[in-house]
């Protein structure tokens, strides 16, 4: 089964330069004059026993003003990491070029608006587009601030994909993250406002119910975009909702 791992990485204006109207908003984009966490993620991938996958680094700037600087910074980081996997950089300029080709082929403007790196849902959809372009049978979606500790991560992520389990074919699976205490809860410092909006408590309760109970593979009402594997039959038919700018804040 052909596999493509896609890692979106988010880059903002230089340190000290304020956010400007129209800039995309992400949790923690890295200023283009800093290193960020991407290299740490790539270096941790060296422990994989299996590197039989194509890697796409999706360079997502918060503004067109930093596109070139972000791409240059990511290129330096990838070369320095020395991962040894077949790696592609996918930039906003590449996406515009693809949009131009599709426009010339007759794709209407409404559909072309979906080709955007602005906002989390659009970024995730471009991740799926990259996997489709590389004819992947499975897309492994990862975040740029993760550290891999299991050398068999790829095998685990692919274990059930395309197989029939409990009478149904598995077209998508999602994993979870461990915090600094080796727990699956959010690693957050308690704040007074949490007394009145206990979203982390609600998430913890949901995590206990889904992650903390057997069996290992089960249906779930939520998933983590940065620990997700999707089969081609799913990701070429079902996109992320482009009208939802975020994911984790939708409902508690």
Where are the regions that the model predicts?
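N-proximal low-complexity "stem/linker" segments adjacent to membrane-targeting elements
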Residues: 1-73
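Short beta-strand-to-loop acidic/aromatic patch adjacent to the donor-nucleotide binding site
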Residues: 136-149
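Conserved donor-nucleotide/metal-binding helix-loop-beta segment in metal-dependent transferases, i.e.
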Residues: 149-172
């Amino acid at each position: 089964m052909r596999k493509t791992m896609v890692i979106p990485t988010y880059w903002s204006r230089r340190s000290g330069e304020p956010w400007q109207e129209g800039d995309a908003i992400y949790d923690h984009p890295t200023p283009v004059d800093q290193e960020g966490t991407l290299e740490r993620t790539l270096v941790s991938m060296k422990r994989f026993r299996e590197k039989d996958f194509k890697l796409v680094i999706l360079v997502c700037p918060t503004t067109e003003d930093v596109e070139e600087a972000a791409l240059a910074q990511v290129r330096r980081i990838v070369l320095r990491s020395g991962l040894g996997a077949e790696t592609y950089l996918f930039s906003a300029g590449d996406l515009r070029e693809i949009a131009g080709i599709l426009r010339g082929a007759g794709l209407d403007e409404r559909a072309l608006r979906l080709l955007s790196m602005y906002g989390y849902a659009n970024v995730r959809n471009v991740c799926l587009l990259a996997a489709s372009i590389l004819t992947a049978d499975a897309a492994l979606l990862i975040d740029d601030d993760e550290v891999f500790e299991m050398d068999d991560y790829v095998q685990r992520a692919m274990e059930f994909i395309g197989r029939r389990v409990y009478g149904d074919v598995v077209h998508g699976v999602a994993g979870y993250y461990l915090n600094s205490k080796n727990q699956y809860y959010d690693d957050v410092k308690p704040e007074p406002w949490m007394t009145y909006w206990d979203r982390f408590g609600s998430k913890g309760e949901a995590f206990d119910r889904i992650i903390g109970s057997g069996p290992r593979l089960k249906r779930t009402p939520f998933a983590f975009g940065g620990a997700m594997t999707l089969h081609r039959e799913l990701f070429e038919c079902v996109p992320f909702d482009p009208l939802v700018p975020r994911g984790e804040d939708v409902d508690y």
